[in-house]
A protein has these predicted regions:
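ABC family nucleotide-binding domain
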Residues: 1-151
């Protein structure tokens, strides 16, 4: 289970997140919808420690920590166990679909390259893109790029 409570984040005087609570049970897929500028991406970036919250708590598996001052090892543990799909796909333009999927496995999760290759090919097969593994993002449709991000 992932649970965040009382998350606050401001940029200057502009409060983006004001006491946000969110609970996601294991295995759930969640879509966060809202108008532009409502804080959707900021919330996800805060949960993944890409932004520092002004206040808030996170519980995930056996981890309990503050979103405003978490230890580096805690941050790495959370990132290794979570995945987010953003509206923009954040693929590396100079890497193939296969290389993009492998990148996170090798760098963030420290998976050996030979195993990462096997996992990445399996993931691309699951999203129907194994036949496009050697294509660069510019050669893929928007939907295909998003599926690479999911893989």
């Amino acid at each position: 289970m992932l649970k965040v409570t009382n998350v606050h984040k401001a940029f200057g005087k502009n409060e983006i997140l004001k006491g946000v609570d969110l609970t996601v049970d294991k295995g759930d897929v969640v879509v966060i919808l809202g108008p532009s500028g409502s804080g959707k991406t900021t919330l996800l970036r805060t949960i993944d420690f890409l932004e520092t919250a002004d206040q808030g708590e996170l519980e995930f598996d056996d981890i309990k920590t503050s979103l405003s001052h978490a230890h580096k090892n805690t941050i790495l543990n959370v990132r290794r166990k979570t995945g987010f799909v953003y509206q923009n796909y954040n693929l590396f333009a100079n890497k193939t679909a296969l290389e993009n999927v492998m990148e996170g496995l090798v760098t963030a999760r420290k998976v050996p390259k030979d195993l990462a290759l096997e996992i990445a090919e399996h993931a691309l097969k699951k999203v129907g893109l194994l036949d496009r593994k050697d294509f660069y993002p510019s050669q893929l449709s928007g939907g295909q790029q998003q599926r690479v991000g999911i893989a």
